Amino acid sequence: MPITLQFGMTFGGRGGSIADDAVRLENLGFDSIWAGEHIIWRHPMHDGLMTLAVASSVTKRVLLGTSILLMPLKHPILVAKAVVTLDHASNGRAILGVGVGGEYPKEFIAMGVKREERGPRTNEAMQIMKRLWTENNVTFKGRFWNLEDVSIEPKPVQKPCPPLFVGGRRGSIPRTALYGDGWIPYMYTPEMYRDGVKQIEEIAHKAGRDPSKIQRTLYAFTSVADSFEEAAGWSAAALGTNYAQDFTQLVKKYPIVGTPKQCAERMQQFVEAGVRHFILAPSGPADKTKGFAEIYAKEIIPTLRKWNA
């Protein structure tokens, strides 16, 4: 039976290249464009929603998602309002991907948020935003936020609301099952993904939710070269710098690296584990990663579509 797959890519550029990158990715045929964010990080990063706002002004078709927005560091009313604005600006193409963060404690210290509260804060925020998008006169009594008779207008273009995806690792599983419209794990193997899908289905069923309505996405760092060793080396160096740890062995386990054929074969393993939407994050030297989009568009994605037709 044919499998419908979607392919997205994260922004690889900085500064003035945002608009150019968005146009290029849409013209190459990608289904979605994604922007991550860190308020404070080891290298320069733009605000995710502002980046997507720029992209919305120069594209017409691609979905525009955050991968991910650090929800515990934001007020849910402000995020809900910003996402509605993006949804209108893009004529209904916005996706809000949220996560709890925590891998860079300086962000939480600077924002005055306790790291141990990041999960419960995100759970409350997700509930609040969905209600603000779909209801008027919202009253909510929580541990972190209290709303009394609050409405935001206009409502989103998408009905009932923009998809709310959950990023992360193990902690993202129950959050997705209970509150999410989609799952975006990262640093996962096919085996981990298959097990995660099973857990989401079980938790969603118990909560009275239909797990078939939860979109199955994967955020995957990727590096493409003439050999596995070269691609793995590029990715290990880049990820090691970003996450301040040794990725020499981890790069063989989590990212999608290798020749175009090897990348396609690894992605097919994820398809068989349940992935239906790939978010590809180029990982490697800046002068090499810019070409990854073309390689995916011309070689890897057509191969996967053929295998799953």
What are these regions (language model features)?
Residues 7, 27-29, 86, 96, ...:
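Residue-level signal for nonpolar/aromatic packing positions in well-ordered secondary structure
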Residues 5-11, 33-35, 64-66, 94-98, ...:
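Hydrophobic faces of well-ordered beta-strands that scaffold small-molecule active sites
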Residues 23-27, 52-61, 83, 87-93, ...:
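Acidic (Asp/Glu)-rich catalytic clusters
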Residues 14-25, 82, 167-175, 259-269:
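Short, acidic/polar
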Residues 2-13, 73-139, 186-187, 191-198:
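Flexible, glycine-rich active-site loops centered on histidine and acidic residues
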Residues 111, 115-156, 187-276, 286-291, ...:
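An alpha-helical appendage that flanks or caps ligand/catalytic pockets
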